[in-house]
């Protein structure tokens, strides 16, 4: 590709991307690199695309001959993202728009979070022949579009950017000789940012029980359609989503009529949000501007067939549920650029700001109508050395002849600054979580088997309505890579307590874990991060082992793109 910019002429776009990434400032607010160009006219928008496995300097030196040939072959098989797909994802246009530092920062964040790009940068090139105009260069690098996974008896194949069109195709098959039918299948299609509307749409079906069934010990077929539009930038006024599905149970293991739960249900969920003071934001600027938004959600779960067993007749999982909830948000958000939080060295955008959400609604469940109110506050604070803290607190509950299903939750995670140890990188985190349920009616007892419990716990003996977890993790990022794979060596320690809702939690027994392991990831590929871990559980309950070895894939973890999400009840789990 021939750039029309003097500083980029005759250069490999991959070298340019590498230089921009290497020189990109981090531990700074995301808008800072663009501020000196604020208000300048955008003359041209130039898109430069880099091959998936484009490597420079030290990587090329260690990746010659057969490995390089393999990378060239994979690049040949891959179809780069179409330039119009990138253009449809821009918040500005050439000739008529001017540079807004905050919109540029939000746009770079949006592009980096597209699931088919491994990285993206927006770079502003000043012009020598005029001082009031600039060229904007968008440089992107795709992730390799093909992927596969094998889990138990399931084989899954997927393409995250089919034909370079910003669309995803998933196919899966399950072969299990113990079930009937022996073969199960699943397929789905996703189109991102339809026609530049920033609406994502998906449609699909599954007969392999991977669409979040309503209960444990059941097997479901599901057909679904989903639409979603986030409030993806500060100046957008509306967002929302729609989910429709039809689901029914399958007796794949030929259970007797006394054990098989024969049911079917329809699910409909729609929500919308409206942001205020957008015009004021455009006039006064984005810095330190408090924003307001309201959102409304309607959801219904309608059973067309219920299990015939008496034990499930009044079980909340198998009864109709309908609710409508509204939310008012008061929030402020900017982004902070850093590295080595969840990823293995590429730029990450950390939200900085706060969100106050006030929620109210009405729910009807098992012919029981009740009112809900709740309040949540979240704050992300960035410190001068690049360390930051994310804090959340929430209180919510229902009213029906008194208060019931009250939930109080506190989350706090501190992320240290990034330390350099010779050529290694170190960042540690310390987290605290507290959860209590008061006057439970539908809420069931919690345990330690969740993300907010203890890593690797799998015990049904420990239950309660109050939980406290304290933990820490240190992540050591290796300076070397092998065949493009990067390595994070981690150590972790956690302690937790469970108790009943009416007792003093600190008098209960401590449960703990000590662990170490390694996480492996190739950021050019769309595969999940591979984690290998060894854990020791002193004082573990009798229904689980004291030593655990794990080999699992973990999903990519990222902070939320916007504080305005689909209104939810504060969960108790």
Explain the meaning of each model-derived region.
Residues 407-409:
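Amphipathic hydrophobic-ligand
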Residues 1-403, 414-573:
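Immediate N-terminus of the mature polypeptide
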């Amino acid at each position: 590709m021939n750039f029309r910019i003097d500083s980029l002429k005759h250069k490999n776009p991959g070298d340019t991307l590498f230089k921009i990434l290497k020189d990109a400032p981090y531990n700074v607010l995301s808008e800072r690199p663009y501020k000196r160009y604020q208000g300048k006219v955008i003359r041209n928008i130039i898109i430069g695309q880099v091959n998936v496995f484009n490597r420079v300097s030290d990587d090329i030196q260690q990746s010659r001959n057969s490995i390089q040939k393999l990378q060239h072959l994979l690049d040949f098989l891959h179809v780069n993202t179409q330039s119009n797909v990138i253009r449809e994802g821009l918040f500005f246009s050439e000739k008529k728009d001017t540079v807004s530092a905050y919109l540029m920062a939000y746009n770079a964040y949006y592009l980096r979070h597209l699931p088919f790009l491994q990285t993206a940068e927006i770079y502003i090139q000043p012009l020598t022949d005029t001082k009031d105009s600039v060229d904007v260069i968008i440089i992107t690098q795709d992730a390799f579009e093909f992927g596969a996974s094998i889990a138990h008896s399931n084989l899954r194949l997927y393409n995250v950017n089919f034909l370079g069109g910003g669309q995803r195709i998933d196919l899966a098959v399950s072969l299990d000789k113990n079930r009937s039918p022996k073969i199960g299948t699943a397929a789905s299609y996703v189109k991102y940012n339809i026609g530049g509307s920033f609406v994502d749409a998906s449609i699909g079906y599954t007969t392999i029980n991977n669409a979040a069934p309503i209960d444990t010990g059941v097997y479901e077929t599901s057909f679904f359609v989903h639409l979603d539009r986030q409030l993806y930038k500060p100046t957008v006024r509306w967002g929302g989503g729609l989910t429709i599905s039809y689901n029914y149970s399958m007796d794949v293991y030929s259970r007797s009529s006394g054990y098989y739960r024969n049911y079917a249900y329809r699910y409909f969920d729609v929500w919308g949000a409206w942001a205020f003071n957008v015009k004021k934001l455009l006039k006064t600027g984005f810095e330190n501007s408090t924003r307001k938004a309201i959102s409304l959600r309607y959801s219904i779960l309608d059973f067309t067939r219920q299990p015939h067993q008496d034990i499930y007749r009044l079980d909340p999982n198998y009864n109709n549920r309908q609710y409508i909830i509204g939310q008012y948000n008061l929030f402020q958000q900017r982004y902070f650029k850093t590295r080595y939080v969840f990823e293995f060295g590429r730029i990450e955008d950390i939200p900085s700001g706060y969100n106050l959400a006030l929620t109210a609604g009405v729910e009807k469940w098992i012919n029981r109508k009740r009112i809900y109110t709740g309040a949540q506050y979240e704050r992300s604070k960035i410190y001068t050395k690049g360390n930051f803290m994310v804090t959340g607190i929430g209180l919510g509950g229902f009213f029906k002849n008194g208060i019931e299903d009250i939930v109080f939750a506190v989350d706090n995670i501190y992320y240290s600054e990034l330390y350099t140890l010779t050529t290694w990188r170190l960042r540690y985190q310390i987290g605290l979580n507290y959860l209590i349920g008061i006057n439970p009616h539908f809420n069931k007892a919690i345990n330690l088997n969740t993300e907010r419990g203890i890593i690797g716990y799998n015990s049904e003996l420990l239950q309660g309505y109050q939980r406290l977890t304290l933990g820490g993790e240190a992540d050591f990022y290796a300076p070397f890579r092998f065949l493009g794979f990067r390595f994070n060596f981690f150590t972790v320690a956690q302690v937790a307590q469970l108790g009943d809702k009416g007792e003093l939690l600190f008098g209960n027994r401590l449960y703990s874990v000590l662990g170490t392991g390694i996480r492996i990831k190739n950021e050019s590929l769309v595969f999940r991060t591979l984690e290998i871990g060894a854990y020791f559980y002193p004082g573990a309950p009798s229904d689980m082992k004291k030593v655990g070895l794990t080999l699992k894939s973990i999903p990519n973890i990222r902070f939320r793109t916007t504080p305005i999400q689909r209104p939810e009840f504060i969960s108790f789990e």
